Amino acid sequence: MEDNKIRVGITQGDINGVGYEVILKTFADPVMLELCTPIIYGSPKVAAYHRKSLDLSTNFSIVNSASEAVPNRLSVVNCTDDEVKVEFSKPDVEAGKAALGALEKAIEEYKEGMIDVIVTAPINKHTIQSEEFAFPGHTEYIEQKLGDGEKALMILMKDDFRVALVTGHIPVK
């Protein structure tokens, strides 16, 4: 039977942050798996580490790409060095590289039509900075990779309520 649910690519974000906690707790609810086919771009080892530290039973399958995602189950595409270490709340350049690797793989598979949307977990905007990523945040990076010269707009939605951000990364003083 073919799975016609929306295929949601979810980037792991900063492995030392709240990303995996939010993802794993969200998909601990079986109802969420009825709504979509979720694919985490990240590390199965890091996901398992967070699952254990949170005492969750959220199961996932390890796949090579979103094309192998298992319906009604969380899948993880490994796009991170297996030796990366998790140190909760600690800024780390390797965690920044892992966040970027996940984002790049999600964008690649989005372009190939393997996923329908990309959801990004929070990054550390300092540790992700590199020659490949010199942007204030996800939105600008995704805009450059997928925007075809058009501007991107971040939208937050719930049912019939939508909020679009008019400015980004401008501090209120």
Predicted regions and their residues:
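Contiguous, glycine/small-aliphatic-enriched amphipathic segments in soluble metabolic enzymes
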Residues: 1-138
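Non-catalytic structural scaffold of enzyme domains
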Residues: 48, 64-68, 104-105, 129-173
